[in-house]
């Protein structure tokens, strides 16, 4: 009888316990333009907006941190697709242009797609003094799009 009561108690706890969505594993890879952009959206998906904000570098963020974080208040998740990056060298830096398409899911479950180009910048590590600046998002331009993100990747001029 005690075993039966314990079984019902365990079942009641299991039913009443909230179900949490699995959080994606942490990713912070700034070695290529594609991995940098995937890491950026990994931070968004984990609601680590301060980490996401740092992917724009020390002085390249498009807006204040408060506005940036507030812009994701109704975002539940983002799926990203990337194309092939092209590179363009400049004195001491390499710029990479990357086609990107995303599917953003709101907290209400609505899906919205965007497509565009990200430009990342790598200041050559061999010419830097500490602290070394890793690759960062130099600029990003996304526009509304519709459809499967695998087919929305645009052509990006270097």
Where are each of the predicted segments found?
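Short helix-capping and inter-helix turn/linker motifs at the boundaries of alpha-helical repeat units
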Residues: 27-31
């Amino acid at each position: 009888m005690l075993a039966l009561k314990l079984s019902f108690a365990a079942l009641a706890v299991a039913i009443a316990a909230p179900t949490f969505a699995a959080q994606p594993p942490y990713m912070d890879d700034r070695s290529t333009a594609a991995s940098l952009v995937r890491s950026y959206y990994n931070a968004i998906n984990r609601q680590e907006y301060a980490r996401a904000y740092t992917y724009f570098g020390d002085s390249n963020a498009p807006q204040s941190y408060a506005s940036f974080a507030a812009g994701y208040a109704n975002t539940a998740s983002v799926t990203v697709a990337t194309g092939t990056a092209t590179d363009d060298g400049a004195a001491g830096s390499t710029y990479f242009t990357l086609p990107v398409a995303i599917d953003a899911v709101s907290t209400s479950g609505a899906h919205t797609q965007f497509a565009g180009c990200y430009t990342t910048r790598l200041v050559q590590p061999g010419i830097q003094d500490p602290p070394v600046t890793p690759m960062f998002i130099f600029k990003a331009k996304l526009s509304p799009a519709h459809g499967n993100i695998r087919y929305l990747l645009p052509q990006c001029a270097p």
